Regions:
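Thiotemplate assembly-line natural product biosynthesis machinery
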Residues: 2-27, 79-86
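Phosphopantetheine carrier-protein modules
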Residues: 20-38, 58-65
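AMP-binding/adenylate-forming catalytic domain of the ANL superfamily
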Residues: 65-76
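Two-component histidine kinase catalytic core, primarily the HATPase_c
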Residues: 45
Length: 86
């Protein structure tokens, strides 16, 4: 599924997009508040995530953005992207 809005992806769009980009493999019914780290978001996946997010949403993610709080769930990640694109 393509993210339709570069400015504020929904958590559901983000789940599909993360799968499509090969960042992390999530089940089709992965919850919006599901734990991404428990689902397999490891350090290598974070590197892929940063590159994909920066490219797709035309933002820069700094070290301060790469916290457990920001990367915990599709909802928190969508919120981070929304703030960065505002």
């Amino acid at each position: 599924m393509e993210v339709t809005n570069k400015k504020s992806p929904t958590p559901v769009e983000l789940i599909d997009w993360l799968n499509d980009e090969g960042v992390i493999e999530l089940d089709w019914d992965f919850p919006e508040d599901g734990d991404l780290v428990a689902a397999g978001l490891d350090s290598l996946a974070i590197v892929r995530l940063v590159a994909a997010v920066e490219d797709r949403f035309e933002v820069e993610l700094g070290v301060d953005d790469l916290t457990r709080a920001h990367l915990a769930t599709p909802t928190t990640l969508a919120a981070l992207i929304s703030v960065k694109t505002a």
